[in-house]
Amino acid sequence: DGSGTVAMLEIAQAFKQASKKGKGPKRSIVFLHVTGEEKGLLGSAYYADNPIYPLENTVTNLNLDMIGRIDPTRKGDKREYIYIIGSDHDSQDLHNLSEQTNLETVNLDLDYRYNAKDDPNRFYYRSDHYNFAKNGIPIIFYFSGTHPDYHLPSDTPDKIEYDLLELRSKLVFYTAWNIANRDERIKVDPKPEVKKFEVDKDILDGYAGNYGAEGIPLKIGVFIRDNNLFIEVMSQAVQLDALADDVFGSEAMGLKITFDTENGTMEFKQGPYNIKLKRE
């Protein structure tokens, strides 16, 4: 519905007006409008690989993706809300700043119902902030939820709740303002070191090929690129992480794949789906 785009433009204009009055932010701000999200977060992935400023100097990513409608469960006297996803995943400091900023400004109901990484909707992994989060950059994903017009031509501007779009845009502006003007950068929470499971290249070669299942129109290609294992499903390539011997997965996609090279099969698990495929 373009709500995130127009909000970003308004926020950029507000920062520019402040800068002209000599009140510009202490930190640089990149207003990033990316495309290809539905094809696999392509635009944000490209930026993460080719950033304007080094990722290690990137303090925070604030992602506005659908902030102009009302979730059917939040109508009536519960309409002044925004779903917050990811604010506490990598930085309690960012989460606290977000909460305090909201209390001191628009005072929306910050709803965390979709915040868990294992939420079955997997919203945390499905929008462009994820390409920053997976690089260790704290993020906040602002989201008003799905609705009957989700991804349909019927999602037209007349259905936008403009008063809520304004409040939500102000919240993001004030949050960005506080982050950009504080003396210290947002603190990232320490993470326990996870040892990566390594697999030799010759073993990876044994998994490569095209897999299919009888009676199911599902084809999965498995290939190696830069000593990493990938699968291709519906023209989308997904890199897999080695989890154990013959076991690979993708946290972002909620995938787990187990290979049986002796029988030339793979077991594909994603959510409620568990499919056995054979190499063709």
Enumerate the language-model features and the residues they cover.
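His/Asp/Glu-rich mid-to-C-terminal helical/loop segments that flank catalytic regions of hydrolases
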Residues: V6, Q13, F143, H147-K191
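Peripheral terminal and inter-domain segments
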Residues: P190-E280
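Metal-dependent peptidase/peptidase-like ectodomains
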Residues: V34-F141
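Alpha-helical metal-binding/catalytic segments enriched in His/Glu/Asp
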Residues: D1-L41, V172
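Solvent-exposed, polar/charged alpha-helical surfaces in well-ordered, non-transmembrane soluble domains
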Residues: V6-Q13, Q17, A45, N96, ...
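Acidic/histidine-enriched alpha-helical segments
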Residues: K21-L32, N61-R69, R182-E198
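Soluble non-cytosolic domains of exported or imported proteins
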Residues: G2-V6, E38-L42, D88-D93, R126, ...
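Sec-exported extracytoplasmic/periplasmic mature domains
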Residues: E10-K20, D49-Y53, E99-N107, K134-I137, ...
